[in-house]
Regions:
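Structured inter-helical modules in multipass membrane proteins
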Residues: 235, 244-254, 261, 270-340
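Membrane-targeting and insertion segments and their boundary/processing signals
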Residues: 214-221, 225, 297-315, 340, ...
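N-terminal pre-transmembrane cytosolic regions of membrane proteins
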Residues: 1-166, 439-441
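Short linear functional motifs in flexible/disordered or boundary regions
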Residues: 2, 24-33, 259, 303, ...
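Short linear motifs at secondary-structure transitions and domain/linker junctions
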Residues: 66-69, 75-83, 184-197, 304
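A broad, low-specificity signal for short, low-complexity segments enriched in glycine/proline
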Residues: 57-67, 170, 175-182, 208-209, ...
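Extended alpha-helical interaction modules
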Residues: 91-274
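Hydrophobic alpha-helical transmembrane segments and their immediately adjacent juxtamembrane loops
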Residues: 331-441
Length: 441
């Protein structure tokens, strides 16, 4: 007899609890506007939402590497003192459009829910050894072994401060246990002063639950594809927070470079200053592009994945990450920086224009002086060098009584040129005064 197909996927059934620590790294792929790697649907079950993820594969996280880790090779600083058993571990590397490479360190732990707290602490603060190597070095080695090109200027891959932890359980947990996991502290709480949020769409069924905190989220008795979608949302948001941190640091660095250019104008030549301003301008344009496509686009998932539970969790995590406020702050920083950069470029243009005016003045004075001296002398020498009836070979060229008509003609030409210059100068001043409104026409 054929069993009927259920109208929806069942909730996940695991005998262990899963911790997935999502960490932004300092590594970036060469093409920032195009995510490298393979579609996540090849590794993660996305259920009925898979077509939407495939359609938007270039705008969502892609898998660079997926590496299973021997559970016996793991050493936890705090977790070693518990009776828990680490059953399975895996390292994921994701690439996100216009964002850094994101590492996801997942471990399956068989224990009571509260015993997860030491493991959460170890994973969050990188107090984990993998095959006698720190987690950071293991991530760098895995990325080096992946078939992907990263930006060489970044140097050795390191784990950044932007991270979020996901806890997946196969059964719902008491609210008090949830708060202990979210705050990573086995202490009592006062619910009135708690900031933990419970997404409505993920808690609408009495048999399932979810809680979102600033750094830890808990999903209980959810369907497997919902868990995977939530993990991909966390990857995208952590990448966005890592990118906006980089943009903020780059904006501050650009401001210091502009200030140094403004303070010490003699350290660099004009060409070097202009080249530096162009480099800063190009850097800021690239940062604005990455802010739009790497951060702002991550704030909304519903237009790509039309699913209430996925969208609800994504928005809740966006709110806790403070991504919208950070976007506004960094956008204002870039706008002010553009104003400062524009003022510095205008100042440089003014200096260059003044230099051009002085250069033209020097050339004009030199050419004018040569003209005043050379033209009359040329006329005089041309007159005496010709075979004219007025030229007497027996007389000196300085004989004023004999040659005064020629000398007077040359002097008259010089004075006429001077008069024309004074007239044009007076006319120019009058026109400028009329434009400025200081001369009555």
């Amino acid at each position: 007899m054929t069993l009927p197909v259920p109208p929806f996927d069942p909730t996940v059934e695991r005998s262990v609890h899963r911790i997935s620590t999502v960490i932004a790294t300092t590594a970036e792929t060469v093409d920032l506007l195009r995510a490298e790697g393979r579609p996540p649907s090849e590794f993660l079950r996305l259920g009925r939402l898979e077509p939407f993820y495939i359609a938007a594969v270039q705008q969502l996280p892609r898998v660079l590497a997926c590496r299973d880790i021997d559970a016996d090779s793991l050493k936890f600083r705090r977790g070693e003192s518990t009776t828990a058993t680490v059953c399975k571990a895996r390292l994921w590397l994701f690439d996100v459009q216009a964002g850094p490479v994101v590492a996801v360190f997942s471990v399956d732990v068989e224990c009571a829910p509260k015993v997860l707290i030491p493991f959460l602490e170890d994973c969050y603060y990188d107090h984990v050894m993998v095959e006698s190597s720190p987690l950071e070095r293991y991530v760098a080695e895995t990325l080096d072994g992946a078939d992907v090109q990263v930006v060489a200027s970044v140097g050795v891959t390191a784990l950044g401060p932007q991270r979020h932890q996901m806890v997946f359980t196969s059964a719902t947990l008491p609210e008090d246990t949830v708060q202990r996991i979210v705050y990573r502290a086995d202490l009592d709480w006062n619910p009135v002063y708690s900031s933990i949020q419970f997404p409505a769409e993920l808690n609408r069924r009495p048999s399932s639950g979810a809680a979102v905190g600033a750094y830890v989220s808990v999903l209980s008795a959810q369907q497997d594809y919902i868990e995977n979608c939530a993990l991909l949302s966390a990857v995208q948001i952590v990448a966005a927070t890592g990118k906006i941190r980089q943009i903020r640091l780059a904006a501050y660095d650009a401001l210091l470079r502009i200030r140094d250019l403004s303070r010490d104008r003699t350290a660099l030549s004009t060409a070097e200053r202009r080249a530096e301003l162009v480099r800063i301008n190009e850097t800021m344009a690239e940062q604005e592009l990455q802010l739009t496509f790497g951060v702002e686009t991550a704030c909304e998932i519903g237009i790509l994945i039309p699913a209430l539970r996925v969208e609800n969790f994504h928005r809740q995590l966006i709110e806790y990450a403070g991504l919208t406020d950070n976007v506004s702050t960094v956008s204002a920083m870039l706008a002010r920086l553009a104003s400062v950069l524009g003022a510095e470029q205008a100042s440089q243009d003014s200096i260059d224009a003044r230099k051009q005016d002085l250069r033209r003045l020097r050339y004009g004075v030199a050419v004018g002086f040569l003209s005043v001296v050379a033209v009359p002398i040329g006329i005089i020498l041309g007159f005496f060098g010709g075979s004219y009836r007025e030229v007497d070979a027996e007389r000196s060229i300085f004989d004023w009584r004999h040659y005064y008509p020629m000398y007077l003609s040359v002097l008259g030409l010089v004075f006429f040129a001077g008069a024309v210059f004074l007239f044009l100068f007076w006319r120019e001043r009058r026109e400028l005064g009329r434009v400025a409104g200081t001369v009555t026409p």
